[in-house]
Each structure stands twice: as C-alpha cells, then as structure tokens.
A protein has these predicted regions:
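Extracytoplasmic/secreted envelope proteins and their assembly/folding machinery
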Residues: 37-41, 68, 91, 95
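Residue-level signal for alpha-helical context at structural boundaries
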Residues: 88-89, 108
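Phosphopantetheinylated carrier protein domains
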Residues: 76-78
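Conserved hydrophobic/aromatic packing and binding residues within compact polymer-binding modules
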Residues: 71-74
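Acidic, Ser/Thr/Pro/Gly-enriched interdomain connector segments
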Residues: 2-61, 100-109
Length: 109
C-alpha cells in the first residue's frame, strides 16, 4: 500500500531563508531588556533604511517608548495589529522583512 503513491521522494535543501534569531518565547514590551531586544532594535534600524516611516532607535537592549513607537510604525506598515508589543507574529514579520532588505539569504549555497 502506498499512501502517497509510488512516485513519492524526499528532497532536501541546505538552507532555507528564515528567522535570523529565534523568537524568545515571550512578548517584548516596555520594560523588556536583553539580547532579544537588541536583535529587534538592530533589525528595525536596518529595515528603516528601506522604510523611512519607521523611526530608528538607540540599540541599547532596553525596550522603551522609542522602541515601542518603532514597532508600532512597523506593525502599521505591514498590516499587523498595532500594539507596540513584539509578539510572535510581529517577531516573525520583522525577521522576514529583515532577511529581505538585508539580502542575507542571497549568497547561501
């Protein structure tokens, strides 16, 4: 018995573009700090080079009002619920757009 048919085969890829840094498992909001905040701040600043409506922020690892405002602008541009909080959908979209604008996936072989 062949559930998928007899011509089924598995193909593999070396690397598929994706999330440069994994979601930390919790939302980032005002008062959050550490590496995940630095990641978001750096990625938002890079995205802002292509989307100037997103304000740049100081990369200090502290999620303050400026980071929240940058996140709100990003969410608005990319049709996400505008909360200023980096939840999983926002993290994933920031990562996806970052990969696109920084072109880090282009030369992977």
């Amino acid at each position: 018995h062949y559930y998928y048919g007899s011509d089924m085969y598995v193909n593999e890829a070396e690397i598929v573009s994706g999330i440069p840094s994994s979601y930390p498992g919790y939302d980032l909001t005002i008062g959050s700090s550490g590496e995940p905040v630095i990641t978001i701040q750096e990625q938002l600043n890079r995205i802002a080079q292509n989307y100037p409506a997103i304000p740049t922020v100081t990369v200090d690892g502290i999620y303050g009002s400026a980071t929240a405002e940058s996140v709100r602008a990003f969410q608005s541009i990319f049709n996400l619920p505008v909360s200023g909080i980096v939840d999983f959908p926002t993290w994933y979209k920031i990562s996806q757009i970052y990969v696109g604008v920084s072109k880090i996936g282009e030369n992977i072989r």
